[in-house]
């Protein structure tokens, strides 16, 4: 149901064998009602919230509602969850009906160290141990600057233009390299006359009167993307 709108259903009573002519349900998994046509066909109607509808995936003749990323496979599916080892879902129809279920996998503590080298550079050492419940590790870099660049073994691997959000890097593709080398990062200072400043959200614009605020690594973290089989 769209936000701000109250869903309503109205049926032609001449076509009903049982059920009401008019329904005004509250969106959610408890909103189910049933009507039966004169031909004896029973129809169950559930009105989901907007968020539930956006998180819905159709699997064969069932629906799956989850915030996790869904990878369908034959006879099963894989759920991917960024940073959360508990994955909530609703699978319907099933023996649980519309009741929410939870899959929990063992939590993992990523292995990572980072240190600043001057005001514009830093070095990150990260390990990617194999765990059956981890699909991939992601490096999140919270920084302020104009452009950030990532190097390994002297070569530029990636760059990122600042827009106020963390720089997220999937590490699986660098697995073999990270076993040999650390990642080196460099950021170029953000200038107060940069033409795109007006396009940035207010919280992303630094205080240029404070030294170093326009060129700084603020926080670095490694987040595991958990996986579970449903």
Where are these regions (language model features)?
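Non-catalytic C-terminal accessory domains or segments of carbohydrate-active enzymes
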Residues: 1-230
